[in-house]
């Protein structure tokens, strides 16, 4: 008999989860949803059920999502060629229209529908709604390999959060609604900007002084040099691991985003594997969690 078929084991699991449910009651938990989980229907359903259970447990979940592969697929379908500078996509006027259509349209509404199918009341938003987020143009620099001189890249309508107003999010929390937010926002200059979903989620979590910010990724978390999962890191520990090369490659910007979220007032940020079914519940409602927790 499996655990799920054993009533006594089910009761024990629920009982063990109770202290964690009480810890997060009435708290804000921001979940950045992306990676492999978004392309897998079963994982998508499991994620939606996790978010519904958080709400039913008295927690205020906020979902921020990405959608890079879906954006690229739509650009290809429409015959819009992508241009890159220093390995980064340039978002011109045509591209940002597609970005908004895909992120704030199809992907956003798919996630909303999945959560609503679990009996909750989710609402799809982007940074434009309720003047929630205003963006500013992002400035990226790279070192020219030939001249070794720092070069400023113009990536078009790629932005970063400049202002976050939590008024609408507080209203939705009081109304028992679950915000699902696409990382698209207006600038004070009147343009629409595409914002990195991790950065966007960190800004939202900081504005809410969230108890937890969860980044669902395609990896278990931060690994040590022996490829073992590190369960918890302070900001100082994380910075030291970047410096000595333990944290490298694509994990560096992810961890730096976590550190910035902590500086903005988030109590703890977790990098965890979104390919593990119900990883959100495992992280929040079990003793050992499911990823790497970064704390001040």
Curated annotation (Swiss-Prot):
Gene Ontology terms describing biological process: arginine biosynthetic process via ornithine; L-arginine biosynthetic process
Keyword list, A-Z: Amino-acid biosynthesis, Arginine biosynthesis, ATP-binding, Cytoplasm, Kinase, Nucleotide-binding, Transferase
CDD domains assigned to the protein according to its UniProt record, in alphabetical order: AAK_NAGK-C (cd04250)
KW Nucleotide-binding (keyword) present: yes
Cell compartment(s), UniProt: Cytoplasm
Pathway of action: Amino-acid biosynthesis; L-arginine biosynthesis; N(2)-acetyl-L-ornithine from L-glutamate: step 2/4
Site (Transition state stabilizer): 32, 254
Sequence positions that bind substrate: 67-68, 89, 194
Domain of life: Bacteria
Transmembrane segments: none
UniProt KW Cytoplasm keyword: yes
Chief place where the protein resides: cytoplasm
EC code(s) of this entry: 2.7.2.8
Record-level Gene Ontology MF annotations: acetylglutamate kinase activity; ATP binding
Alphabetical list of PANTHER family matching this protein: N-ACETYLGLUTAMATE SYNTHASE, N-ACETYLGLUTAMATE SYNTHASE, MITOCHONDRIAL
Protein name, as recorded: Acetylglutamate kinase
Species of origin: Brucella anthropi (strain ATCC 49188 / DSM 6882 / CCUG 24695 / JCM 21032 / LMG 3331 / NBRC 15819 / NCTC 12168 / Alc 37) (Ochrobactrum anthropi)
